[in-house]
């Protein structure tokens, strides 16, 4: 994921309600959605959660690891969460995605320690 894309997402971060996030996840997961619809849904999810990704990445910066690499890993966690999230889950998408953001960052730290 490019640094400029992450910077642009942070600049235009939007707030999506739980219902709106679920709708974006449903669009992203739906085989009936076009590639453009899936891309737009994913962009909205990334934009709505990029500040949380920033926070998670910042918590893992140590030993000279590049913050941008960690931020990219956190965003990969959002993408993974969007593909695996169960729409009937009682947990919010953000809560679920945060687990995957942390996991991706921890894997990156371990691989590059």
Regions found by a protein language model. Name each.
Residues 2-113:
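Alpha-helical promoter-recognition and RNA polymerase-docking modules of transcription initiation factors
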């Amino acid at each position: 994921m490019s640094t400029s894309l992450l910077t642009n997402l942070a600049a235009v971060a939007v707030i999506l309600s739980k219902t709106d996030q679920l709708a974006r996840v449903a669009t992203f997961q739906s085989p009936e959605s076009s590639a453009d619809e899936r891309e737009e849904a994913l962009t909205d999810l990334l934009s709505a959660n990029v500040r949380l990704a920033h926070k998670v990445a910042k918590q893992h910066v140590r030993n000279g690891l590049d913050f941008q690499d960690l931020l990219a890993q956190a965003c990969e966690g959002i993408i993974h969460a969007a593909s695996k999230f169960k729409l009937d889950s009682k947990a919010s998408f953000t809560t679920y995605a945060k687990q995957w953001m942390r996991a991706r960052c921890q894997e990156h730290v371990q691989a590059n320690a």
